[in-house]
Amino acid sequence: MKTGTKNRQIANAYYNIGLEKARSRDLSGAVTALKKSLRFDKYQTDARNLLGLIYNEIGEVGSALTQWVISLNLQEQDNLAEEYLRKVHAARGYLELADQAAKKYNQALIYAQNDNEDLATLLLMRMVEEFPQYVKAQELLALLYLHQEDYIKAGRCLYQALKIDRYNPWVLHYMDIAKHNTGKAE
């Protein structure tokens, strides 16, 4: 069997795993599987398109756009990426909102790294109100709440993140900590 054929088969297997994980809302697991798929076959537009959809779902719009543009460049005809890009551009203010969310997240991360947790918390609170599907922001806000020992607020953020990405390992870990400290551990 030729290497190219074998690589495509492995890529398809990882794509199928990613598709199943996405269907069960294990979006972080799906991202991992789809990235592996693309390592074996970078021309697999179905994997790129699904990866873009997942990135968009978890609030990482820039990464979603990147995957769809690459996909469209690889296959110009009969490609769903064209429709996805059209829908994102047609949604009034969506790209601007996503861009502002990413900037606020990065600023909050800098605040948190420089021991300015209050400003980071305030910025993230406003951000997740405007852009609640940004899982990383929910996760960082919950982590700040955990550090401040406000386990109930942390649990609320983590619950919102788990509604989007049901099996995110870090969110599940932080949720265990929050539950343990609120007495709600199972």
Spans of features found by a protein language model:
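Register position in tetratricopeptide repeats
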Residues: 23, 57, 74, 90-94, ...
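TPR-adjacent "capping" and linker segments in tetratricopeptide-repeat scaffold/adaptor proteins
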Residues: 1-13, 89-103
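Conserved structural position within tetratricopeptide repeats
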Residues: 5, 36-39, 70-73, 128-129, ...
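Helix-start (N-cap) detector for alpha-helical repeat units in TPR-like alpha-solenoids
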Residues: 4, 11-12, 45-46, 79-80, ...
